[in-house]
Amino acid sequence: MPSRETVDAFIAQVVSNDHVGAIRDWYHEDAWMQENQARPRRGGRSKLMEQEAATLARMNDVLTELVAPPIIDGDHVAIRWRFTFTPKQGQRFAMEEVAWQTWRGDKIATETFFYDPKQRGG
Protein backbone atom coordinates (compact mmCIF):
# COMPACT_ATOMS: atom_id res chain seq x y z
CA MET A 1 0.00 0.00 0.00
CA PRO A 2 1.53 3.34 -1.02
CA SER A 3 1.86 6.16 1.47
CA ARG A 4 0.60 9.66 0.68
CA GLU A 5 4.25 10.77 0.43
CA THR A 6 4.98 8.04 -2.15
CA VAL A 7 1.98 8.98 -4.29
CA ASP A 8 2.87 12.67 -4.01
CA ALA A 9 6.45 11.93 -5.16
CA PHE A 10 5.12 9.98 -8.16
CA ILE A 11 2.75 12.84 -9.05
CA ALA A 12 5.55 15.42 -8.75
CA GLN A 13 7.68 13.45 -11.22
CA VAL A 14 4.82 13.19 -13.73
CA VAL A 15 3.92 16.89 -13.37
CA SER A 16 7.59 17.74 -14.06
CA ASN A 17 7.00 16.01 -17.45
CA ASP A 18 9.40 13.16 -16.65
CA HIS A 19 6.83 10.64 -17.89
CA VAL A 20 9.31 7.97 -18.97
CA GLY A 21 11.30 8.40 -15.75
CA ALA A 22 8.11 8.05 -13.71
CA ILE A 23 7.43 4.70 -15.37
CA ARG A 24 11.03 3.65 -14.72
CA ASP A 25 10.94 4.71 -11.07
CA TRP A 26 7.39 3.90 -9.99
CA TYR A 27 6.14 0.89 -11.99
CA HIS A 28 6.72 -2.79 -11.29
CA GLU A 29 8.84 -4.67 -13.79
CA ASP A 30 5.74 -6.61 -14.92
CA ALA A 31 3.34 -3.63 -14.89
CA TRP A 32 0.69 -3.05 -17.54
CA MET A 33 -1.49 -0.14 -18.65
CA GLN A 34 -4.92 -0.03 -20.23
CA GLU A 35 -6.77 2.73 -22.12
CA ASN A 36 -10.54 2.95 -21.58
CA GLN A 37 -10.80 -0.80 -20.97
CA ALA A 38 -9.17 -1.69 -24.28
CA ARG A 39 -6.76 -4.61 -24.24
CA PRO A 40 -4.03 -4.04 -21.65
CA ARG A 41 -0.63 -2.95 -22.94
CA ARG A 42 1.54 -5.72 -21.58
CA GLY A 43 5.25 -6.33 -21.87
CA GLY A 44 6.32 -4.84 -18.57
CA ARG A 45 7.94 -1.61 -17.50
CA SER A 46 10.53 -1.46 -20.28
CA LYS A 47 7.86 -1.84 -22.97
CA LEU A 48 5.71 0.84 -21.29
CA MET A 49 8.70 3.18 -21.22
CA GLU A 50 9.33 2.54 -24.92
CA GLN A 51 5.69 3.25 -25.80
CA GLU A 52 5.63 6.44 -23.70
CA ALA A 53 8.85 7.68 -25.31
CA ALA A 54 7.35 7.06 -28.77
CA THR A 55 4.23 9.05 -27.86
CA LEU A 56 6.29 11.94 -26.49
CA ALA A 57 8.51 11.92 -29.60
CA ARG A 58 5.43 12.86 -31.65
CA MET A 59 4.93 15.99 -29.52
CA ASN A 60 6.56 19.41 -29.44
CA ASP A 61 5.26 19.95 -25.92
CA VAL A 62 3.18 18.33 -23.19
CA LEU A 63 1.80 20.26 -20.23
CA THR A 64 0.86 17.97 -17.34
CA GLU A 65 -1.48 19.15 -14.59
CA LEU A 66 -2.97 17.55 -11.50
CA VAL A 67 -6.65 18.54 -11.56
CA ALA A 68 -7.60 17.26 -8.09
CA PRO A 69 -5.86 15.61 -5.14
CA PRO A 70 -5.35 11.86 -5.49
CA ILE A 71 -7.68 9.46 -3.74
CA ILE A 72 -5.82 6.68 -1.93
CA ASP A 73 -7.65 3.63 -0.60
CA GLY A 74 -5.33 0.81 0.40
CA ASP A 75 -3.61 -0.48 -2.75
CA HIS A 76 -5.81 1.61 -5.05
CA VAL A 77 -5.12 5.17 -6.15
CA ALA A 78 -7.23 7.41 -8.41
CA ILE A 79 -5.62 10.48 -9.98
CA ARG A 80 -7.34 13.10 -12.14
CA TRP A 81 -4.97 14.56 -14.73
CA ARG A 82 -5.11 17.12 -17.53
CA PHE A 83 -2.60 16.80 -20.36
CA THR A 84 -2.27 19.49 -23.02
CA PHE A 85 -0.50 18.10 -26.07
CA THR A 86 1.13 20.12 -28.83
CA PRO A 87 1.83 17.59 -31.59
CA LYS A 88 4.56 18.10 -34.17
CA GLN A 89 1.79 17.69 -36.73
CA GLY A 90 -1.79 18.68 -36.06
CA GLN A 91 -3.72 20.82 -33.61
CA ARG A 92 -3.00 21.30 -29.94
CA PHE A 93 -5.51 19.48 -27.71
CA ALA A 94 -6.17 18.87 -24.04
CA MET A 95 -7.36 15.70 -22.35
CA GLU A 96 -8.66 15.12 -18.87
CA GLU A 97 -8.57 11.59 -17.54
CA VAL A 98 -8.75 9.56 -14.38
CA ALA A 99 -5.98 7.04 -13.82
CA TRP A 100 -7.06 4.06 -11.69
CA GLN A 101 -3.96 2.41 -10.27
CA THR A 102 -3.34 -0.77 -8.31
CA TRP A 103 -0.13 -0.61 -6.30
CA ARG A 104 1.94 -3.47 -4.90
CA GLY A 105 3.92 -1.91 -2.10
CA ASP A 106 5.51 1.31 -3.36
CA LYS A 107 5.18 0.52 -7.08
CA ILE A 108 2.32 0.59 -9.59
CA ALA A 109 1.29 -2.85 -10.83
CA THR A 110 -1.64 -1.91 -13.09
CA GLU A 111 -3.11 1.31 -14.42
CA THR A 112 -6.30 1.94 -16.38
CA PHE A 113 -7.00 5.36 -17.89
CA PHE A 114 -10.61 6.54 -18.22
CA TYR A 115 -11.36 9.48 -20.54
CA ASP A 116 -13.67 10.67 -23.28
CA PRO A 117 -11.91 9.67 -26.53
CA LYS A 118 -13.54 12.64 -28.30
CA GLN A 119 -10.97 14.80 -26.51
CA ARG A 120 -8.35 13.31 -28.87
CA GLY A 121 -10.56 13.68 -31.89
CA GLY A 122 -11.63 10.02 -31.70
Please give the residue ranges for each predicted region.
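Alpha-helix C-capping/helix-to-loop hinge sites
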Residues: F10-Q13, Q34, V62, F85
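A beta-strand edge to alpha-helix "cap/lid" segment located at domain peripheries
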Residues: M49-G122
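Short coil/turn residues that cap or connect secondary-structure elements
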Residues: V15-D18, Q89
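A solvent-exposed, acidic/Ser-Thr-rich amphipathic alpha-helical stretch
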Residues: P2-E5, V20-D75
